[in-house]
Amino acid sequence: MTKLYYEDQYMKEFKGEIIEVKELDGKFHILLEQTAFFPGGGGQMGDLGLIDGIKVLDVYEEEGKVYHVLEKEPKKLKNLQCELDWERRFDGMQQHLGQHLLSGCFYDLFGANTCGFHLGKEISTVDIVGFLDEKTIREAEKEANRLIFENLEVKSYAPSKKELKKVKTRRALPKTEEEIRIVEIVGLDLNACCGVHPRNTRDLQVIKIRRWEKHKNATRIEYVAGNRAVGDFFTKDEILGEICKLLKSGEGDTLNAVKNLLENNKNLVDENRKVKAEIGNYKIKEMLNKSERIGSITLVNEVFDGEDTKHIGKLANKITEEYEAIVLFAVKNGDRVNLIFNSSKDIKKVNMSDILKDTITLIDGRGGGNQFAAQGGGKNNGNTEVAIDYATNKIRNILI
């Protein structure tokens, strides 16, 4: 069979003739005498589209033959109208060439080789050996975009075994008896690859590195190329426009406006923290003044409504750290209630975990802790006051 995708990678439609049909699991696997449907390979996704108006669900290669998986069997065998999902194909070509271009630039500029890549449906990644800094990454990105506008020719061919011995690729050739195809960005990169690529770098349009991270002994670089990069630009431009409206600033002033906003927010957070601490200290004094004393121990109990549980927990810790005290707090929020039981570490007679376990059944809850601190929550906040009174009486009986 003839693989048209290697002869003309820009072919969007063609006429086909069926030479074999296999029915497997209710689907029809069609072999044509020629096809422009790329079955996938080299990390690149395979083509989809239509054959005789029937949706192509998958394309795969088996023993050198390219099969097309269809929902139903075509009614005729010859002169079938075959159409590729061109947007999908061209996107795959752009992302794949983008990987070759970035890999070539990193190797050409810094001698850094590629140790892996992934061509995804939304974003793609390339792994470059070593840990690269931002300056290095941006330099490679700029060089890649410069070469796009240089309109370098991209060649794809399958040398004979004799010719392969003279080919010097960026990475070692795979050891196989099968045909090895070469993709060459003229003047930059030469590598083994069975994928389908644009004829020149200009068809790549633009390439944008979005972010990067350390990955094992390499730097994993996330990028978008071609139409994806253009779409990414428009999306970010729209977002920037909305941010400018919210900040009431021009694009050039956006960064400073955000910095000022963050600084003002930090100041407000600091001020709010100080106010909360002052209110907390006042609240602690108020609770201590009205609390019951059993010998040298102050027994503090309180029910809060709509308060932040973490904040109330901090108040409990502060009281038991600064005073010889036992704290029994309940915090109602909606239908739920949280119990926070604490005691000073020099009070050995009372185990807060045991007190909580006995009490929490009254609010249909669960919880746990240790001798000096225990917490839990339940869904029956109608029994909150009963639960606190029950725990208070248990502690009285232990201490008196």
Q: Whereabouts are the PLM-identified features?
A:
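Glycine-rich, acidic loop segments that terminate in or are immediately followed by a histidine
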Residues: C193-L204, N301-I400
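Active/ligand-binding-proximal structured segments within catalytic/core domains
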Residues: T35-I51, K75-V126, F372
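Hydrophobic helix-and-loop "lid/oligomerization" segment in the mid-to-C-terminal part
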Residues: E238-D335
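Divalent metal-coordination and catalytic microenvironments
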Residues: G42, H100-L102, V126, G195, ...
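A generic structural motif
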Residues: H29-I30, E63-K72, S124-I128, F372-K379
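Functional cores that coordinate and move charged inorganic groups
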Residues: R88, D108-H215, I400
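Conserved nucleotide-binding/hydrolysis modules and their immediate coupling elements
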Residues: M1-K78
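A conserved active-site cap/scaffold subdomain adjacent to cofactor or substrate pockets
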Residues: P198, R210-A257
